[in-house]
Amino acid sequence: MSYTIAITECPYSGQKVSLDRMGNKFTVCYIVPLEDGAHDYTSKRFDTLADALSVYQKFIEYFAKGLYSVTDRKNLLK
């Protein structure tokens, strides 16, 4: 069973981050709108909700500060 737990959109750029449950794992997905209307997705799976929430929270902090590049944000999921 898969479902979205939370999704947050950056008010400045339209970028989004979602926290999803996929079976017994949790996934953080970073979504970047491209100029041609398509989207670039980067995601990472986590074994625990605590680990996934930690990364999800970091994205929200990055969105709030507005100081970090797309590359910096993608690096959170490496």
Residue ranges and their predicted role:
Residues C10-P11, Y30-L34, R45, N75:
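Secondary-structure transition/turn motif
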